[in-house]
């Protein structure tokens, strides 16, 4: 029911019609990848593309380059992708899901590793529209579902590899989320997950009072030991830490493509090792878990 409602709202969105008009032009496009997703069309639709992209702000994940238009997104998402890139060989000829896929940046980047199938899940109309704009030009076989992680167990297709990046701390029941990820896997499937974490040897999690780094929907920020316990309780047998990284103002910053504040405004101005609330500043752990 929720999916049908979101799909209806998406299809009735005025920008969807504009994107379909652009798609109908069937513009020749050279699609290439480096740190940004690059689309070269040399078309006469540049003004229309600029208008649509501006109306689709904020652009969080990226960057994207469409001809001479550079969408300088809030996150330099290639930094996260490059952390995971040494492990991307595991998606070759595999059925892959990206849970919380935002506008599809990571999925576009994954194409160079030749997955057999690539499906993104995110119940956000705005992010789906951003994806549809890029894909109207790129013409990739990526599929985008207006669904959340809770829809995985009954989706009807199981995955060899699932990416779930920057989602778990937004969930009020992280173990349930991990169980949903497990239910979406094929036998011998693998999950790549990242989360903010706290430095502590104990099996504990930070439960922010109202906000964490000015973000209201952060429920739990675990220690790595606590995260491992969550994964084991959800039924995962293998837990491997791939990397850790502190989030800095090079990776996340305010640009003209967002109309709100960013990391520099979320940290204590006197001590960048603390959030504005006095918690540890954001840092992330990247893990690979298997059943």
Swiss-Prot record:
Alphabetical keyword list: Transferase, tRNA processing
Residues that bind carboxy-S-adenosyl-L-methionine: 61, 75, 80, 100, 122-124, 149-150, 169, 284
EC number(s) stated in the UniProt entry for this protein: 2.5.1.-
Enzyme kind, highest EC tier: transferase
Cysteine-cysteine disulfides: none
Reaction it catalyzes: carboxy-S-adenosyl-L-methionine + 5-hydroxyuridine(34) in tRNA = 5-carboxymethoxyuridine(34) in tRNA + S-adenosyl-L-homocysteine + H(+)
One Pfam family here: Methyltransf_9
GO molecular function: transferase activity, transferring alkyl or aryl (other than methyl) groups
Biological process terms in GO annotation: tRNA wobble uridine modification
Chain coiled-coil ranges: none
Protein family membership: Belongs to the class I-like SAM-binding methyltransferase superfamily. CmoB family.
Subunit structure, as described in the record: Homotetramer.
UniProt-listed HAMAP family: tRNA_carboxymethyltr_CmoB
Role description: Catalyzes carboxymethyl transfer from carboxy-S-adenosyl-L-methionine (Cx-SAM) to 5-hydroxyuridine (ho5U) to form 5-carboxymethoxyuridine (cmo5U) at position 34 in tRNAs.
Protein name: tRNA U34 carboxymethyltransferase
